[in-house]
Amino acid sequence: MDLSATNHRIPLGDGNSIPIIGLGTYSEPKTTPKGSCATSVKIAIDTGYRHIDGAYIYQNEHEVGETFREKIAEGKVRREDIFYCGKLWATNHDPVMVRPTLERTLKVLKLDYIDLYIIEIPMAFKPGDVVYPRDENGKWLYHKTNLCATWEALEACKDAGLVKSLGVSNFNRQQLELLLNKPGLKHKPVCNQVECHPYFTQPKLLKFCQQHDIIIVAYSPLGTCRNPMWVNTSLPPLLKDTLLNSLGKKYKKTAAQIVLRFNVQRGVVVIPKSFNPERIKENFQIFDFSLTEEEMKDIEALNKNVRYVELLMWRDHPEYPFNDEY
């Protein structure tokens, strides 16, 4: 795979293509200063990123859209150069809500279409505007999940030209097979966005997806933040790993750059999230070196098969995806 800083798109199963590195824009709305996302997207585009990964529930899509318009007006990029991924949240799985939810994202971004729209998690929650619905006792309010019906509503959005490609996130093999075997399937999922890094290499899921022309997009490709609400903090931080740091010394790179290069060489798309200008630039500097076959095997051997992001608060949901082996 001959990838460079200016040419790093890889083909998707529907004939479209995706840049192999993107900027993740996840943020905690309550604690993230206004404008942080816009500044980060500007720096990313100026650095050479063309893929931005976002979601309506991050509450910063308006900043992403403003930055796109600004950079297009400057002549830095054209709309067709930019690849934006949005997400359908768990409270909007009801088929009648799918198109209005996507249209709301388009309105906030002020775009005519987005490049990729994915089901964020395979678990449905009580429909409505409350993102994390619970009852008065704090119990999560779940909703009957019908992934095939949700998918049909997404297919109609693609047919209407609102989105170029459709995908999923946090799906296990069984949930992917449910869609792939759906009677009358019009559009296959082009990607499955999942946690993937040297401590959690996902070999079986990766192989299954490759067999079905589904790209793996790696979230938390550098390990993750240490927020105990989301994260298994008993795991050691990935970027402190001895092997990754010794390879970093060899190539005059950081452990983070080694980790990103590892996944890119496996054909896995990476979307490291950062609002730190230096790290945004650093994460992109992965096209001027390659790891040897031996080094790739050594990094693969670091796999502990343990997730940082377990979503344990929803493990009693009938569609909780992480009980299966993969």
Curated annotation (Swiss-Prot):
**Which terms does the record give in the GO molecular function aspect?**
Delta4-3-oxosteroid 5beta-reductase activity
A Pfam family of the record is Aldo_ket_red
- CDD domains recorded: AKR_AKR1D1-3 (cd19109)
Q: What keywords appear on the UniProt entry? A: Bile acid catabolism, Cytoplasm, Lipid degradation, Lipid metabolism, NADP, Oxidoreductase, Steroid metabolism
Q: Which residues bind NADP(+)?
A: 22-26, 53, 169-170, 193, 219-224, 273-283
Supply the EC number(s).
1.3.1.3
PROSITE patterns named among the record's database cross-references: ALDOKETO_REDUCTASE_1, ALDOKETO_REDUCTASE_2, ALDOKETO_REDUCTASE_3
Record bears the keyword Ribosomal protein: no
* Any single GO BP term: lipid catabolic process
The entry's function note states: Catalyzes the stereospecific NADPH-dependent reduction of the C4-C5 double bond of bile acid intermediates and steroid hormones carrying a delta(4)-3-one structure to yield an A/B cis-ring junction. This cis-configuration is crucial for bile acid biosynthesis and plays important roles in steroid metabolism. Capable of reducing a broad range of delta-(4)-3-ketosteroids from C18 (such as, 17beta-hydroxyestr-4-en-3-one) to C27 (such as, 7alpha-hydroxycholest-4-en-3-one).
Family stated for the protein in its record: Belongs to the aldo/keto reductase family.
Protein name stated in the entry: Aldo-keto reductase family 1 member D1
The organism encoding this protein is Oryctolagus cuniculus
Gene name of this polypeptide = AKR1D1
